[in-house]
Amino acid sequence: MKRRVVLSLRAEQHVAAIYDYIFEQSGELRADTVVGRLLDACHGLDTFPLRGTQRDDIREGLRVMGVRRQATIAFMVEAERVVIHGILGRGQDVNRLFEDAGE
């Protein structure tokens, strides 16, 4: 069963920040390529959502998946959708994902 993939506001903000950083460092083409790959990886969870590593130690039901050693996608699988809670750039700590939001 395919699930709908939804990016949270926080995940959308992460995508924008990653794009801006790469754009400043390497230009528009590279930023488009990297962000495109990240979003493709997110939307690929619609068919096979139980990928990555379960991280109940951070939040019950949270899963994380690395993307090409460039980023980590943090997400939760629900009955009919996959919610992307964060897309963290290389070196960012997934443990702080929910702390920073005060959750």
Description of each model-found segment:
Residues A31, T53-R55, R96:
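Short, hydrophobic secondary-structure boundary micro-motifs
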Residues M1-V35:
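Arg/Lys-rich, positively charged N-terminal/basic patches that mediate binding to nucleic acids
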Residues A71-E103:
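Enriched for short, Lys/Arg-rich terminal
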Residues L7, L38-L39, L45, L88:
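Generic leucine side-chain signal with a strong bias for well-ordered alpha-helical environments
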Residues V6, G66, V83:
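Conserved beta-strand segments that form the floor/walls of ligand-binding pockets within enzyme
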Residues D40-V67:
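A short, surface-exposed loop/turn module that caps and links secondary-structure elements
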